[in-house]
Structures are given as structure tokens and as C-alpha cells.
């Protein structure tokens, strides 16, 4: 489901940015839910998530964009940071994919807020596709013995 939402978001990003962003937001939430299936989150993950989320929200307040974009940025950051924080402790390939996905999202938001260059666009899309491939390969080809740590 999350990959389909990412695909839909990719397909319509130039036509309907808000709809595309909603697709990505829901995809991040679906990934987080899947990560909970593989490993119950630890208390420290919640603490780190809240701290990172708060720091990014503070930074968002200093960006010169409309209030609506700031609200959207906070909501999107909520899902992005959750995906990264709750990826710790699950198979490393998923964790690395989640971190790269986060970086690609930050680059995409930067490109959206400021004028994008060919280089920044290349790094944004390049890191996005690497992240999606890392996650997809691990999900589609199985987990072996790594699944469901309950510690």
C-alpha cells in the first residue's frame, strides 16, 4: 500500500502538490505501522522521535513560507521522523532505506521552498529512488530470520 501511495504521489507531484504530499504522508504512516509489526517500539525511540520532531518544528518556524505550508511541514515532519526513529531495531536494510528516504524528503522540501537546481533535484530524486529500492527489495524478497524481534 505504501509503495502504491508513493507511486501515485510521484505521478501527480507536478500537477497536484498537496495531493501528492498527502499520498507521501499516508505512505510514511503505513511504513511506520509495518515497522511496528516487525518490532515493538522502545521507549527511547519515542523520546528521540519527539526531540527530533520538536527540533525540526522549531526550524520550520524560521522558514519564510506561508502559515499553511508551515502547518503542512509540521504534519509531514511528524510522519517522516516517525519512519526513521521506529526503523531502528528492524532489519538494517529497512533502517538504512528509511534514513535515506528521510534525507530525500528533506531535500525535496528544500527544493520546494527554494528554487531547485539540477544538482539538488538529482540528489533529491536519486536518494529517494535508492531508499525506495532498499525498502522494496527487503520487503519483496523476504526477511529470513530477522523478522519480529520482541525484545
Residue ranges and their predicted role:
Residues 1-151:
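Polytopic alpha-helical membrane-helix bundles and their juxtamembrane interface segments
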